[in-house]
Amino acid sequence: MANNDQKRDEGYIEKLVQVNRVAKTVKGGRIFTFTALTVVGDGKGRVGFGRGKSREVPAAIQKAMEAARRNMIQVDLKGTTLQYATKAAHGASKVYMQPASEGTGIIAGGAMRAVLEVAGVQNVLAKCYGSTNPVNVVHATFKGLKAMQSPESIAAKRGKTVEEIF
């Protein structure tokens, strides 16, 4: 499992979460292909993930990075942490994320850490339950981040002020 960090011209932070070799058995032997899982973010709340497949590792990574840039979402952050504690699941992977005080850092494992870092979250407590398959953990983390809304956006949808909601 690789964990690469790159900055590009566009201001995006790119992280390689996983490279996996897959073998297809055919009459003449085995055909090896590679799959790559990457996350891309601007460090200010925009984050995306992508998967790419190819016969060569660099091509798979490139395809995954392009897919991640096309699949970006906006996360409503509260400073450098999350708005509130949230849970999400994808397949057998379940994730729990909660805001943390300033100076805590990112307390999260593996694939979850990569997503939170590129999203711009700097203080968070997170835990992964069930399956730790990186693909499912990234999906679950995205579901949790995507479902999170700021009090301002909830107030606007209801046609009320933030004070009326609390």
Swiss-Prot record:
Domain S5 DRBM positions: 12-75
Alphabetized UniProt keyword annotations: Ribonucleoprotein, Ribosomal protein, RNA-binding, rRNA-binding
Family: Belongs to the universal ribosomal protein uS5 family.
Subunit structure: Part of the 30S ribosomal subunit. Contacts proteins S4 and S8.
Recorded domain comment: The N-terminal domain interacts with the head of the 30S subunit; the C-terminal domain interacts with the body and contacts protein S4. The interaction surface between S4 and S5 is involved in control of translational fidelity.
Family matches, as PANTHER family: S5 DRBM DOMAIN-CONTAINING PROTEIN
Protein name: Small ribosomal subunit protein uS5
UniProt source species: Pseudomonas entomophila (strain L48)
Lineage per the UniProt record: Bacteria, Pseudomonadati, Pseudomonadota, Gammaproteobacteria, Pseudomonadales
